């Protein structure tokens, strides 16, 4: 899913305090007793699929009832932080990469190492994303990669050949210039200030890094990372993308949906909305991202985790394991909302929208790079936005903005280690 930028959390201290101040509210019910589990999720679009999965689980486990609690993503982690600090978080809930280490490091998640989960059933990048200090805390639910969505009608009108899987950065940049027609309000691409969909991908394609493998230092000031950032600022300066101010007024996502953007770097999750839109339903298609110095795309995905203070740990663990089963994955895939993480179940998702080449998102798995995270990802996510905004609005050079970001990010990472 698209990971919206959020302000730096103050959750660390609250979660640390709650880790020692609270304990499980009660012991797990006996094997013969009836229990109700609370299941926290944030996407209403996926609720129908989750209800089907819950129904299948309850049929197999008549003594367990699962109550799905949907909280909008904008409020989800704020409410979860409060609930976890007070010992009342859902028994099982969705977790994403940027927040995972914060909760795992503060003892809020239950180890699933003994839940009978075969981690070879999922992409290794997703398994490792939800592992902390060698312990598995999350069961991979789904994953997403980023592809090049494009408007076939705009390409045809401009006489430009459609993108292929062999496109390079140069091919993409040349097409963006030819497709831009400001007299019609059409731009080649929207260079949004988004890491997951845009600049993380080009940083990795240029051979750069966002954060070091040990999570202790920023990679933004390397020549390769700067090249990956300039990929986007150059498109803005040349006029092949709207300005940052224009994109703040009208998001490129909306421009693409309305036929005013020829190309859009977007996720596998966008298929649902594009298929429901009158314009993109028939005019859009997708292929793999263009190749830079090398191929790369960001991979991210959600996991189901168990609250360490659940009153029903055995039942919660059992439900989490079921959520990671092939049966649950098949249900998710059939709805077409997300790519299920369980290996071998993805083709049903591909077939859900035959008008699009969704296989492209799976073809990228061999070179996918995990979404960059640390113990307090949100702290330096905020620094990315504040510093790179100056480069995106062209008021500051990319090397200068990257240098300032590196200094501030290194300080934030050093604070994590204290």
Enumerate the language-model features and the residues they cover.
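Short, low-complexity disordered leader/linker segments with a strong preference
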Residues: 1-38, 59, 407-418
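Extracytoplasmic "Venus flytrap"/periplasmic binding protein-like
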Residues: 56-124, 157-159, 255, 259-263, ...
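Hinge/lid segment of periplasmic solute-binding proteins
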Residues: 97-147, 283-286, 350-354
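Conserved C-terminal helix/tail region of periplasmic/extracytoplasmic solute-binding proteins
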Residues: 156, 162, 237, 366-418
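C-terminal lobe and pocket-closing loops
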Residues: 269-281, 292-386, 415-417
